[in-house]
Amino acid sequence: MAVCIIDHDNIRGVIYFEPVHGKDKVIGLKSGTYSLIIHRYGDISQGCDSIGSPEIFIGNIFVNRYGVAYVYLDTDVNISTIIGKALSISKNDQRLACGVIGISYINEKIIHFLTINENGV
């Protein structure tokens, strides 16, 4: 399993990638449709400007009027090929937030839904 933590301005969330699908929740966006895109590099030293070119379009997420997107995407991405790369949340080709995809501990007893609130908890 792989995981990506997004935390930029008021946009926060944790997305887990499993062999069959990706799922979780993202908060802090205005209502509308956004794209999840995997980029070439996992370098966030200059924010989303240093993550390189888009490589894999994961899918669209739909944010409700409360600023919450519940993410559940079927994708055939090979997890071992995305470790160390970046995931961006984008709208109209503008990268709004990004994070590095890393390896996550696998524990079948844990439900993989996590929200980070405005206090970082």
Swiss-Prot record:
One of its GO terms (biological process) is superoxide metabolic process. GO terms for molecular function: metal ion binding. Disulfide bonds join 48-98. Its main location: host cell. GO terms for cellular component: host cell cytoplasm. InterPro entries: SOD-like_Cu/Zn_dom_sf. Virion protein with no enzymatic activity. Belongs to the Cu-Zn superoxide dismutase family. This is Cu-Zn superoxide dismutase-like protein. It comes from Vaccinia virus (strain Ankara) (VACV).
